[in-house]
Amino acid sequence: MEQTPHLWKEQEHTLCRSFVFPTFLTAIDFVNEVAALSEKHHHHPNISVDYRCVGLSLSTHDNGNIVTAKDHKLARAIDRLYRSNEPR
């Protein structure tokens, strides 16, 4: 299994990461992009939004709410999405 970047932390049987954005609207745009990506993966994170900060947590409910390869795969895809939207 390919390793997930260190910015994701495994806590209480979930894979978690926070992303900070310059504005509330850019945070919401990211949430919408994550939603579309999640649909393609048929795997959906728990999402929280606190002004400019988006929190994501992943676990595989079908396997008893544990972290699986499916979670790591989506985490890597989300990281690629985030990097593709970073200001240059």
Question: Where would I find each of the regions flagged by the language model?
Answer:
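Conserved glycine-rich FAD pyrophosphate-binding loop
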Residues: D50-R52, G64
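Short aromatic-glycine-(Arg/Gly/Cys) micro-motifs in beta-strand/loop hairpins
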Residues: M1-T14
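Short, well-ordered beta-strand elements within core beta-sheets of diverse protein domains
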Residues: T14-P22
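Short amphipathic alpha-helix segments
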Residues: T26-V34
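A generic structural motif
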Residues: R52-S59
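Short, glycine- and small/hydrophobic-rich beta-strand elements in well-ordered beta-sheets
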Residues: H6, N46-S48
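Short arginine-rich
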Residues: E10, A35-P45, R83
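C-terminal structural segments of small proteins and small subunits
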Residues: S59-P87
